[in-house]
Every structure is written in C-alpha cells, then in structure tokens.
C-alpha cells in the first residue's frame, strides 16, 4: 500500500513570506545604541529597508548581497524549493542587478522528514538557479524543528544603475509586474477551499523570476524599484514613500489580482500576516474597505516588482515588459508630500 503524500505545510507554523517578523517588532530587534560603522563604499545598507545590500568594488561595479529563507508555503518539496529560490533571487533583480551565484540555507527536522524530501527541495532550488543562469555553489544546513529553505545570493550591478526604494519622485506612475493574492490563494489551499480551476496558479506566479528588473535598471526614468513580498503592497509602497519623501494614490480597480481573490476573502481565506501588516502600516493609509485592506495587505511570497516610473520613461518600460511577455498598466501615481493627506490614499 502506497504511503500518503507528505504535506510540508503541516510541519510549519508559518508559510512563505507570511513568516516574516512584523515591521513593528523588527524595529525593536534592530534598534541599537551603538555607533554605526561608516563605510563610504557601502552604497545601500539597511537604513531604508531596501531589498539588498550593495557594495562598490570599483570601476563602476557594485556587488549585491542578499538572503531570504522561509518555511513551506506549498506541500510539494520540489515546488517549495523553486518558490524559495525564486523569491531569494528576486532581491537582486529588484536592485537592478544580475545574479551571479547562490548558496543554500537549509533547516530540516531530520527526525520527522526523510532526507530524500530535503533533496527534492534542494533540487527545486537548483532548477531555478539554472533558470537564472547561476550556480548553486554551496550552502549550510542545520537540524531544525521546522523545515526552512532559502538562498544567500550574490549579484552585480552598475553603480550608476542601482535601483533603491528611496529615490522615487513626485509625478512617477506606479507599475506592478505580478498580480496580488498569493497569500489568499495559498491560504485557500491550506483550508481545502481552493477550487480545481485555481490549483497551481499561485505556485506558477511565485515561480516566475523577476528577470525584467535587470533590464528596467537601464532606464534612468525608473526612479525606484522594489519587490512586493511579505509586507504586502501597502507595506512595500509605504517604504518607498517614506524613504523618498513622497506620497501615493493607488487606483484599486487597476491593481492586478489573481482570479477569485475577493471570493476567497469572503470565505475567510485571509492569512495571519495580513493583520500584522495592517497593524504596522495601517496608520499611514487613508480610508479603505475591509476587502481592500485584505487584498492590499496580503503578504506576497515571491511577488512582483513595484516600479516608480517618470512619465517620459513609460514607453521604455512598456517595451521591456513586452519583451518579457508582460503587459503593464499604471496602478497609481506618486505626489509631493502633503501633511494634510495620508501617506497612501486609495481610490476606486
């Protein structure tokens, strides 16, 4: 008799980027009274919660360094590896860079899950690294109470083309390269409420590499770029606005979303990270309905790129998007700071 299929999500208390520590708590953890070491060649550190660190090694070249790991968001081990690797590599693309190598991070409950299952996870990560044109060059593993997998990724970028999350300008249009709703659909699957026609949609979305980011880097009018992950669209947009000294207007109806997300929200398929995100960022946001809040605060795992684009660069952005098989439409715009308004306002 065949043994039942392993459900990895049963072995962890969190899922994907929804495992992230809330921004409020993270601020307390990272607080320090120590004087910060100053290195003029460190172009991007953690001051603005950017996607990766960037270090100037001379001759116009910057090294990008980032790491990302989490607990299973899907049951299939190979897919878990694919998703975790795609998510980790995304931070390099979000800085406008090109990945050059990765090393693996693995935590595994060896008394609960067979090593052959961990091997499938690693194979999923290796597969995505090959898609990105890089080697999975090594790694580190520990015996852990819950399965954890991710990568530490190294990339390169022109120091003139680094895309920070803190350089956006008033007048920029906002573009999002992947639909929202990943946390909602994966929660629906975990609750056995996902309809047959929607199976696999979230997984394939999470496994799409954000390669266009390396091409968007060549456009000066792309003033800021980040990837939308565990803090949701509102969280990551808030960081752009706060870091850049601007405010935003979001057009809710223009925001791409996965099929039937509103229906699943109505059925209670809302991940726990949604509430944590709102607790951290809700005071910065204007009026919105419960439905809007639950979608816009939905924690994304391996979500899309969020771009701030000056009007004269929109055609170039659309051209690159088309080369990658995407059609983009603006989801909002950035405005000058005005203390009479919320940091982000939601309109229909």
Curated annotation (Swiss-Prot):
Q: Which InterPro entries match?
A: PurM-like_C_dom, PurM-like_C_sf, PurM-like_N, PurM-like_N_sf, SelD_I, SPS/SelD
Q: Which SUPFAM superfamilies match?
A: PurM C-terminal domain-like, PurM N-terminal domain-like
Q: Which residues form the signal peptide?
A: none
Q: What is its EC number?
A: 2.7.9.3
Name the residues annotated as site: Important for catalytic activity.
20
- A cellular component annotation (GO) from this entry: cytoplasm
Active site, per annotation: 17
Any GO molecular function: ATP binding
Q: Where does ATP bind?
A: 20, 48-50, 68, 91, 139-141
A Gene Ontology biological process noted in the UniProt record is:
selenocysteine biosynthetic process
Where, by residue number, does Mg(2+) bind? Answer: 51, 91, 227
Purpose: Synthesizes selenophosphate from selenide and ATP.
Q: How does it assemble?
A: Homodimer.
Q: Which HAMAP family match?
A: SelD (MF_00625)
Question: PANTHER family given for it?
Answer: INACTIVE SELENIDE, WATER DIKINASE-LIKE PROTEIN-RELATED, SELENIDE, WATER DIKINASE
Family membership, please give it. Belongs to the selenophosphate synthase 1 family. Class I subfamily.
- Protein name stated in the entry: Selenide, water dikinase
